[in-house]
Swiss-Prot record:
It catalyses: CMP-N-acetyl-beta-neuraminate + 2 Fe(II)-[cytochrome b5] + O2 + 2 H(+) = CMP-N-glycoloyl-beta-neuraminate + 2 Fe(III)-[cytochrome b5] + H2O. [2Fe-2S] cluster binds at residues 62, 64, 83, 86. GO terms for biological process: CMP-N-acetylneuraminate metabolic process; N-acetylneuraminate metabolic process. It comes from Asterias rubens. Belongs to the CMP-Neu5Ac hydroxylase family. This is Cytidine monophosphate-N-acetylneuraminic acid hydroxylase. GO terms for cellular component: cytoplasm; membrane. Gene3D superfamilies: Ribonuclease Z/Hydroxyacylglutathione hydrolase-like (3.60.15.10), Rieske [2Fe-2S] iron-sulphur domain (2.102.10.10). It comes from the Eukaryota. Pathway: Amino-sugar metabolism; N-acetylneuraminate metabolism. Its EC number is 1.14.18.2. Its cofactor is [2Fe-2S] cluster. It is a single-pass membrane protein. Keywords: 2Fe-2S, Electron transport, Iron, Iron-sulfur, Membrane, Metal-binding, Oxidoreductase, Transmembrane, Transmembrane helix, Transport.
Length: 653
């Protein structure tokens, strides 16, 4: 039986707006009683509005003996509930029992805030799919089950005679050119990956679905079985466009055992916050369970198996341009630093609590080992601090000393049998002298490949702007965006475009000035290579904002969920027809932009690009000074003066 999402009850937009900050007790009938907690501190981020993580929900039923909760009159923060049977207390903000302390966590329902302002409370059914055909653990031998860490979220799992890999990002960048591998993978990674029996890929982000890695894999073994979840946004939605040949992709329903052999099976489960794209996996070998929650914010709606043999999850944070790439208003360096510090600490404690709830034999923090290594992203690297895996493991050990923890190094191997029986040597580190951290990334190869898009002929016709934004399909939203193309360091670039798009109507319009009506305004300065690659290939906008490839300001300072959600996962699944566009332009005899490619720039035209619509002199493309060309004649003059002075001195002696 596959897992399905079922709406338990709904609140209308009016009922949702009437929810108070803190605890709300809702009774639909004697048997239908619920708790909804509304977090007044929830904030918008660049990836999601506050409403997506503002609410928590559960049945109004104590986990101890089924009593009903009432508000605790001693609680001044409006988050503590007291059971009428035995006085147990639940903190609705964390969904953990605080009396008795360290006892249980409450099983949660999944709140989903809708576009019309209504709120659905959803339950995954069956809520605990791993209970279906449950198996008792069988004895293991040393060496029978081994987990080898490679990089980021990529591990090799030996399950008897079977080899399974997860999320292979082992070469090249992710999110265009924004993320680079922190760790150097084992030297034989490609041989081992190509010989694997199966691969699980959790979702479509390029630090998990990495086409540079998969391209090399496909040349060795295009028929390797690859398993993905049946998400509404398909993991391999851009496979054909990528040119990578993979012939054995399996799309699987959620919460259903996938039988590999008599000893090995696994299931894919959805995320409660991002069910349209994020998944996690539960692996069962002879009744021993390995839980890989990857990037899921609320894996399986918060209901996870207890007492698994091993758990792996993300931990680091920093997987977004917010707030480092934002400017204006409150976004001072001090505000950013405080925000990052606060959010990383919250994430650290959230992950600690999640691990304690699952109570695995051993826990491994992973899926956070990336670095903003390119020199042009030095600012991001210095400000986008991330959690330390050792700090998380120390926190877990402080409150749950029985949980073993592992901060992995590439090539290190965990033996599950040794971990279960309590051996201290359950980890085998790679040989001394093995390189752990990468110190070379082949920047030029990958950045040049991206920047080839700058020279695509479509950008010689300004009409590409109208063609592309009509293709996106986003409309009927009172938002004006300004898109400005910049160089790698976000300085003006000759031939770059600078334009506005207004989405208020059935079709976008393209004003040269901001409209007089009241409207939301979003301004983005984008690296020209990444911007043009995104446009030409019809890619999701993740490369721009998760990859730190733009700089953003907005008026008012509001997160526009509908816009970002559309550009992130709702773009058309067919590419823009650029061949047809070029054919039409040439048939119509459309004029080309005077300068549309920085390589065309000459001193004569560099002072002004009349094809660009100017908004202000500080940001107008094509109006900046080229200091190298200005200083070249000056250098000649200085040299001539120097020669003259030398001659004068020699003659005066």
């Amino acid at each position: 039986m596959e897992q399905e999402r079922e709406i338990v009850f709904s609140l209308s937009p009016e009922e949702t707006s009437e929810l108070k900050n803190g605890v709300n007790l809702i009774s639909r009938s004697e048997k239908e009683k619920f708790v909804i907690y509304k977090d007044p501190t929830a904030e918008n981020t660049v990836e999601e509005p506050a409403t997506s993580h503002m609410y928590k929900a559960c049945l109004n039923k104590c986990k101890h003996q089924g009593g009903t909760f009432i508000k605790d009159i001693e609680d001044g923060d409006n988050c503590i509930l007291r059971c009428t049977k035995h006085g147990w207390k639940l903190d609705a903000k964390t969904m953990r029992y605080v009396n008795p302390p360290d006892s249980f966590s409450q099983q949660q329902l999944v709140p989903e805030y809708n576009e019309d302002g209504s709120l659905d409370i959803v339950e995954l059914k069956p809520p605990q799919p791993w209970e279906t055909d449950k198996r008792d653990p069988m004895p293991l031998e040393v060496g029978e089950v081994q987990i080898t860490y490679f990089t980021h979220a990529c591990i090799e799992i030996k399950l008897g005679d079977l080899i399974m890999f997860t999320d292979p990002w082992l070469i090249g960048p992710a999110f265009a050119r924004g993320w680079w591998l922190m760790h150097e993978p084992p030297a034989d990674w490609l041989d081992r990956l190509a010989k694997a029996d199966l691969i699980y890929i959790s979702h479509l982000h390029s630090d998990h679905l990495n086409y540079p890695t998969l391209e090399l894999l496909s040349q060795r073994n295009p028929d390797i079985p690859i398993y993905v979840g049946d998400t509404s946004m398909p993991v391999f939605v851009r496979l054909e466009q990528s040119g990578v040949k993979l012939n054995n992709i399996h799309i699987k329903k959620f919460g259903k055992w996938i039988e590999i052999n008599k000893d090995t099976r696994f299931m894919i489960m959805m995320d409660g916050v991002h069910p349209d794209m994020d998944t996690c996996a539960l692996i069962d070998y002879k009744g021993h369970l390995i839980l890989d929650t990857v990037d899921c914010t609320n894996p399986n709606g918060g209901r996870l198996p207890i007492g698994v043999d091993m758990m792996l999850s993300d931990f680091a944070g920093g997987a977004s341009g917010f707030p480092m790439t934002f400017s204006g208003g409150k976004y001072t360096e001090e505000w950013k630093a405080e925000f990052v510090k606060r959010e990383r600490r919250k994430l650290l404690y959230y992950k600690m609590q999640q691990v304690r709830d699952v109570a695995p034999t051993v826990y491994c923090p992973f899926a956070g080992y990336f670095v903003e290594a390119h020199p042009s992203d030095h600012y991001i690297r210095s400000t986008n601090t991330k959690n330390d895996p050792d700090a998380l493991n120390a926190l877990i050990n402080k409150y749950s000393p029985n949980i073993k923890t592992w901060s992995p190094s590439p090539g290190a191997v965990l033996d599950l049998k040794k971990a279960i029986q309590g051996d201290r040597d359950f980890i085998t580190d790679p040989p001394r002298g093995t390189q752990k951290f990468k110190d070379s990334w082949d920047f030029e190869k990958y950045v040049n490949a991206i920047n080839k898009n700058i020279e695509e002929e479509i950008f010689s016709y300004p009409e590409w702007i109208q063609f592309y934004y009509k293709w996106t399909g986003f409309k009927n939203y009172n938002l004006v965006i300004r898109m400005v193309e910049r160089d790698d360091d976000f300085c003006p670039v000759v031939g770059g475009y600078d334009f506005m798009v207004d989405f208020v109507g059935e079709e976008p319009t393209f004003p040269t000035e901001r409209p007089a009506r009241e409207h939301s305004y979003l301004e983005m300065e984008n690296r020209i290579g990444v911007h043009r690659e995104t446009v030409r290939q019809g890619l999701f906008w993740d490369d721009l904002y998760i990859g730190f490839n733009n700089r953003i300001s907005r008026e008012p300072d509001t997160f526009h969920y509908l816009f970002w959600n559309h550009m992130q996962i709702l773009l058309p699944r067919t590419d823009p027809d650029w061949e047809g566009f070029l054919r039409d332009m040439k048939t119509e005899g459309a004029p080309q932009k005077a300068i549309w490619n920085p390589s065309q720039a000459t001193p004569a035209v560099e002072a002004k690009d009349p094809s660009s619509d100017s908004k202000d002199s500080a940001t107008k493309p094509g109006t900046h000074w080229n200091y190298e060309r200005l200083l070249r004649p000056l250098g000649i003059v200085v040299a001539l003066v120097g020669v003259g002075v030398a001659i004068w001195k020699s003659e005066s002696k």
